[in-house]
C-alpha cells in the first residue's frame, strides 16, 4: 500500500524531472489556486510517503481506521474548522488524490467553488463528458437546469450507451460544499466541538461512502 500508484515517480514535471501523481496534483492545484489550503486524508501506512514527496506543504489528517469516504470527509472538515480555524462559510472541495488531468480540470474546481459561494446549491458535483460507454464508472444523469435527476452506479456497457444518449456524465467523484454544511450533517451522528472529539468518536460514524450518505440524499 505504501507503494501505491500515486507515489510512483513515473511522470515528468514541467522541467522534465520525475514526479509522482501526488506531486503532480499538488503542483497543478498550486498553479491554479495558489492560496488554497490543501489537506490530505489518509491512513497511517501512507503518512511517510506523503511527507517525503510533498513535505510540510500540505496538512495531513490521519484516519483512525478505514471507514469509507463519509467519515473521512467529516474528519477532514472538522480539522479545517477546529484546527485550521477556517470560517465555516468557506467553500471546501473534495477530490481524489490521483486524477491524471490537464489544467482545465483544476480550473473547473475554481468554477465549482464560485457556484458554492453564490449559493447555487448545497453541493456541486463534477460531471465528466464520457468518451465511451464505460461499465467502470458511475454516472450522473442531469436535468436541463444542471441539477441532478438521478445517479447510476457502474451500468452495463449497453445501458451506459443509453445513458450517454440521455446526456449522462461520468461521476468525477469531486464535491464542493460549504464547511458548515458538512459540520451540520456530522452533528446528526456525533456530538462534538473539537477535532479531537470527532476523532475519538470516529468509529461511531457510519461506514459508508459520501455519495450514498450525503450526495444521493440531497
Question: Each PLM stretch: what is its role?
Answer:
Residues 1-50, 56-67, 79, 106-107, ...:
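N-terminal glycine-rich phosphate-binding loop and ensuing alpha1 helix
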Residues 3, 34, 56, 88, ...:
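Residue-level preference for short coil/turn positions at secondary-structure junctions
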Residues 9, 62, 125, 150-153:
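Structural signal for conserved beta-strand scaffold positions within catalytic alpha/beta enzyme cores
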Residues 16, 66-71, 172, 205:
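Short, conserved micro-motifs enriched in small and acidic residues
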Residues 32, 53, 83-86, 118-119, ...:
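Alpha-helix C-cap/termination motif
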Residues 37-39, 91, 122-123, 174:
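Beta-sheet entry/capping signal
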Residues 58-144, 183-188:
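Conserved beta-loop-beta/alpha segment of the NTase-like Rossmann-fold superfamily
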Residues 129-130, 139-218:
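Catalytic core of tubulin tyrosine ligase-like
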Amino acid at each position: 500500500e505504501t507503494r501505491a500508484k500515486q507515489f510512483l515517480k513515473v511522470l515528468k514535471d514541467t522541467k522534465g524531472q520525475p514526479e509522482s501523481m501526488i506531486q503532480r496534483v499538488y503542483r497543478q492545484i498550486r498553479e491554479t489556486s495558489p492560496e488554497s489550503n490543501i489537506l490530505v486524508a489518509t491512513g497511517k501506512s501512507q503518512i511517510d510517503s506523503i511527507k517525503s514527496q510533498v513535505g510540510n506543504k500540505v496538512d495531513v489528517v490521519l484516519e483512525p481506521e478505514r471507514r469509507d469516504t463519509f467519515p473521512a470527509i467529516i474528519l477532514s472538515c472538522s480539522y479545517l474548522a477546529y484546527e485550521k480555524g477556517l470560517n465555516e462559510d468557506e467553500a471546501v472541495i473534495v477530490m481524489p488524490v490521483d486524477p491524471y488531468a490537464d489544467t482545465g480540470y483544476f480550473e473547473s474546481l475554481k468554477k465549482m467553488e464560485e457556484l458554492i459561494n453564490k449559493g447555487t446549491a448545497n453541493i456541486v458535483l463534477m460531471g465528466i463528458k464520457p468518451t465511451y460507454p464505460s461499465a467502470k464508472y458511475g454516472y450522473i444523469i442531469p436535468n436541463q437546469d444542471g441539477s441532478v435527476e438521478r445517479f447510476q452506479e457502474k451500468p452495463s456497457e449497453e445501458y451506459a450507451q443509453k445513458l450517454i444518449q440521455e446526456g449522462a456524465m461520468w461521476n468525477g467523484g469531486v464535491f464542493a460544499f460549504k464547511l458548515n454544511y458538512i459540520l451540520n450533517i456530522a452533528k446528526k451522528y456525533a456530538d462534538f466541538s473539537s477535532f479531537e472529539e470527532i476523532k475519538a468518536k470516529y468509529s461511531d460514524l457510519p461506514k459508508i461512502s459520501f455519495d450514498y450518505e450525503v450526495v444521493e440524499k440531497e
